[in-house]
Design a protein with these regions (language model features):
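The feature marks helicase ATPase cores and/or their adjacent C-terminal helical subdomains
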Residues: 1-315
């Protein structure tokens, strides 16, 4: 801070890299008030290059009380896209806004961020994904269920019907399949000395790697080795079947979720913001968090109403 004060008084020209309006780590020592005062008279870059008109206007309304308090204005020119703002009473409510969200997740290749202030919103979001059969991942982590696991469920019936599969895919089958189809003593096979080409189920049966009845077992969930608690395992299988019934996309996971504090600096096509808070917080802190949340999106945004006593961004 002393270095910044000295720079601001002696340097003829200096640059701020960042945004005082996104100062959300006060719990870690960040001084939002200082950054607001330091940057309020600075010449600003005007083009945002991210948010469409609707999200841009929403973010300006969110930040207006802070701008008025510190006596500055931000231009924040939007992109050419307009976009829509939808309202959800909850993630369990069937309504036109929910239909629009599910339709866009299912029928476009756009990305989605579900973000929130904290618990228990994280559990609500994950339960929503599982209920709707939506592939998802936490920001910065792998998918909740690996692609290769879902792929095994999808491709095993085709393999049983005689379609050749790559050696890599056969290795993936081996990671999950059990003694119902694999010959005793072959469960730990690594296939390291096998030629990297396609193989049929008949080939593996003839070579005594799969049992003679393997091709009759068309449901991969019935030949897998159970891992973890039975209840959790069964829920996992139900979730996988929902994904397959909706049409499995083998591309990157497009739906992510995370706490607002972990999404700063990220960009998604669409954003879903849960306004639930479980305790009171400084009003300006709430506004900065709310702004960070919505400004991750480029096109459309959904607001999920607070499910408790406190609402993010409301005194």
């Amino acid at each position: 801070r002393k270095a910044l004060d000295k720079m601001a008084t002696k340097a003829k020209e200096y640059y701020f890299v960042g945004d005082a309006d996104q100062t959300i780590f006060e719990f870690a020592g960040s001084d939002a008030d200082y950054y607001h005062r330091l940057s309020r008279n600075a010449e600003q870059l005007e083009q945002g290059h991210r948010c469409g008109v609707t999200i841009n206007s929403l973010c300006k309304r969110i930040m207006r009380p802070i701008w008025n308090y510190y006596g500055y204005e931000r231009v924040w020119k939007p992109t050419g896209f307009v976009g829509d703002h939808y309202y959800l009473p909850s993630l369990q409510t069937n309504c036109s806004a929910m239909e629009a969200l599910l339709d866009k997740i299912q029928n476009t290749n756009e990305t989605f961020l579900f973000t929130y202030r904290g618990t228990p919103s994280d559990s609500w979001v994950k339960n929503f994904f599982k209920r709707e059969g939506i592939e998802f991942a936490h920001v910065g982590n792998n998918a909740h269920v690996p692609k290769k696991e879902i792929r095994c469920h999808k491709l095993w019936p085709e393999f049983c019907r005689g379609k050749p599969m790559s050696l890599k895919q056969i290795k993936d089958f081996w990671d999950y399949a059990g003694s119902k189809v694999i010959v005793r003593g072959k469960g730990k096979e690594t296939f390291e000395d096998w030629i990297d080409r396609e193989y049929t189920i008949d080939y593996l049966i003839n070579k005594k790697f799969l049992k003679s009845t393997a091709s009759e077992e068309r449901d991969f969930s019935l030949i897998r080795v159970q891992k973890g608690k039975k209840e959790d395992y069964e829920k996992r299988l139900i979730y996988i079947k929902k994904i397959l019934n909706k049409g499995f996309n083998d591309g990157d996971v497009r739906v992510k979720y995370a706490n607002i504090h972990t999404v700063k600096g990220l960009t998604f096509d669409n954003v879903v913001v849960d306004l639930t808070m479980t305790r009171p917080e400084d009003y300006f802190t709430q506004l900065r968090l709310k702004y960070v949340a919505y400004s991750r999106g480029k096109f459309d945004c959904w607001t999920v109403a607070s499910q408790g006593k406190y609402t993010l961004g409301v005194r």
